[in-house]
Amino acid sequence: MTPQELLAELLLKNEKEGRRMLQTDIHIFDGPSLALLVELIKREADRQWNNNAQVSFMLAGYILAIGDLTNNKAYHALGLMARGDALRRMDRDQDSLPFFDASGEEFKEVGDEVGWARTRIGRISACLQLNRTSEALRDATAAREVFMRHGKLLRAGQIDVNAAIVNYELGQYDQALRLFDRAIETYSLQGEGVELNIARALGNKAITLAPQGKFREAVALHEQARGTFAAYGGQEVAVAREELNIAQIFASQGHYSQALLLFSRSRTIFLQHNLQFQAAEVAQQICLCLVRLNRAREAFELAGETVTFFRSSSGHRHNLAYSLMYQAEAATLEGNYGDADVMLQEASIILEEGGFMALASIVRLQQAELYFAGGQLEDSQREAQHVADAFAEQEALPQLARTALLQARIAASTGDINTAQYLCDHALDIAQGQGLLDLKYRCDYLLGQIAERRSDLEAAARYYDRAVQGIDEVQNHLVLDERTSFLEDKGNIYQRAIILALKRDNKDQALIYVEKAKSRVIGDYLRNNIDIRLRAGDKAGEAILEDLVKLREEQAWYSSIVYEAENEANLSDTAIMRIRAIAPEQARKEMQLRERRIEHLLEQMQLRLAGDLVARQRSSWTNSIVTTLWPKLEQDTTMLEYYIAEQDLYIFQLTRKGIDVHIVQDAVPQLERLHSLWRVNLDLAARTAGTQDQAQSFVGLEDNSLGLLQKLYDLLLRPVSHVLDNCEHLIVVPYGILHYLPFHCLFDGTQFVVERLDVSYLPAAALWEICRQRGERIETKKARLSDSLVLGISDNGRLQFAVQEAEVVAKQLGARPMLDNAATASLLWQFGARSPIVHIAAHGLFRLDAPNFSHIKLADRQLSTIEVFNLDLSCCSLVTLSACETGRAVVGGVDEVIGLGRGFLYAGAASLLPTLWKVDDASSAELMEMFYQALLGEYSKTAALAGAQRAFLTRARTSSRPYRVHPYFWAAFHLIGDPGPLL
């Protein structure tokens, strides 16, 4: 039996069986063969560190057994060291120290000075994890001297790297850099075969450069190290570590999407190699990105998971402190100042006890920011001053800039404008020099406020403009919903810029800022043709798609239980059995769990698809998007764009003559009250419709609705009625709560607005040109109306007129209606790309809690917002969603509209006809027949809708059911996007 064969046999045994085999077979090996066997076992034990530390532990036991069986103390010492290394890899650092110490003593006894020095390598790492840094540095000095004396250059370099890491953790960056450089120099003296060692040292040196703000140099070193590891092969974990480090720098600079992409990639590799500890460290870094993107709840929960993980691990106390810091930051963002303070106090104690003063300073900076958020200015100033001195001494420039900005905010809050200016300029200088995007715009914003307080409006306007541009720069590096969440707390910056521009009578500039805050995500993606549709193309992408399909099926199943339980009387026996299989409360939890997983996977896919686009600079949002808009409007067209600041309403009026603005002071409280009453009226109308006494009940409801709609008209349109006198087409660009109001059925005291004007809507004025060009492009294609896709589902008889509506519309278009079981979502993927019209009459559900999962119920699945994004509707002139609340949305960011409509616009549709509330299916069917009749009669889309609504009103007023004049029956439909001709 050869040593190689014995090792192969040992790997198949448990430790007890392996020891018996050694007792039986060890005598057959002579001295050289025995030495080879020990070397092979030790090499395999080292190889198993990252794969299976338990196997490494067992192999160390075999070396110990060989030492005992042969009375060879050197082998026994080697076994002790190997066992210590295995324990360290099992996160049992405290348990590993006695083995390293015993091993060192035995090596000394046999006169092996180098062997003793080798035991210090693992011991230093264990001491670092146990916060015994003085011991670690003492061991490093002694061991290096031994290695150099014996010409063991690789070992000497390794010791220097370990000592440098200890100094880095202590915040002694200059000493750490000197040691890394010495290690690299020592490796180079060795000659060949040191590339991987040098790469590791370069990567660690880069980590030390980052806290000093030397980001470009650090990234270059990480890239160099990553290239070396990738070239050698079999270094997946090492490559992942370098990507993790690059991601940390990207996060510091405000490139959050790039950071999240690399974090996700490295975390996946760590988990694949069962490196739970390293995966938890990556999760910590992800928390930081989530906080910066205002995703506080996600960050808090993820940080909580890492807190639990590191509490259960022996040692690693500074990692626990990191987790507490990130969780505290998320708690602060949510306004839970008390919880955040408790977390920071625990983190501070851990770090100060361990001597991690650099990290302890960051905790104190967080405490200073927490005090400032809570209005404790004196406490905040005290802590900030302390850490400012510490960061200056450490040359930790990013943290120093962050501290200076906080001190500037404190000074500004206490009226010390000169000090605030000085400190903020200092912070901005550092931020600009280091490329700290997130810090730059915040400095410019504060400088704008300072200039405004000094009545230097020109300087204030300049600073505010730079702040807005800074936000744009960060957004350019984000994908989809990350942009929306990032903007959540930026409204005040836009507001100050807008109000100051108006104060300086710069109406164009004010409108530019309003537009920059509105529906930027969909607008930017459409302008830049960024394709984030899910598609197979690589193994990783296909795996994500498979997971998404499975999760989406499960989410839809639980969703059907949650939202159909209320209508059990109308369900099939199968549906009732499904609902009774699990309680709706538990089903809701399961549904929400899968929705979070789906959104996470979608984000990963979007990062993969758009990653290279967010990494490079693109053409940014330009002011000409607004300034060239109004001259292109038709002579008879007026665009009204609304904005809300504090309690005031701003109405921007765009006509071919130019831009004007009217301010309605103290309008917001009235708007909120009237909107609430309007929703109550609609809800009552929905309950009353179809009842036996509906004719009598609607008398009061109609009078009430007219009163509410007239008051809304007085606030929203009467102040600018003079521009409507010569107008035929009104384009409304709402803001905030106004997205939920039907401007076309506001009442002027005599008639509804739609009775004298054609009305269409846009989420943002900047989308007007995009939608108009789409309409013109589709018009030139001369598509056949018979290729239109018309779907109708009665939903087990609950929507009696949906199928009838689809049949009538299909007949008008010369298309084949797809009804009930034939009305599947798969048809949209199969035929949507060549359909000039997509008409869906079905049940819709708006999800206020999760707008990305608002959906239309089709025969084979729920067609949700996230799936609509993946459709190709590039030849579609009009999408009609004749279903409940398909036009409702959640307003996120500053004014980002999130709902089904956004998905259809992204998919390529030129215009959209959704509903603002739960509709009466009989009235909808009647209105749709009138609409398509007008549309096919050469009317534009907006004129056809207005004509249909006028015809409906005329018919209702002269019929036996005059109560149908109530807007509930006819006004839910509104046109979004291109108002022009169909084809």
Language model features with spans:
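Tandem amphipathic alpha-helical repeat scaffolds
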Residues: 3, 7, 38-51, 77-92, ...
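Catalytic cores of enzymes
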Residues: 616-983
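Repeat-mediated protein-protein interaction surfaces in helical alpha-solenoids
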Residues: 13-32, 58-66, 471-480
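N-terminal alpha-helical interaction modules that lie
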Residues: 1-54, 516, 520
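Amphipathic alpha-helical segments of tetratricopeptide repeats
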Residues: 64-68, 104-111, 141-152, 181-191, ...
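Internal alpha-solenoid helical repeat scaffolds
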Residues: 20, 31-45, 52-211, 217-241
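Amphipathic alpha-helical protein-protein interaction segments
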Residues: 3, 441, 457-754, 781-789
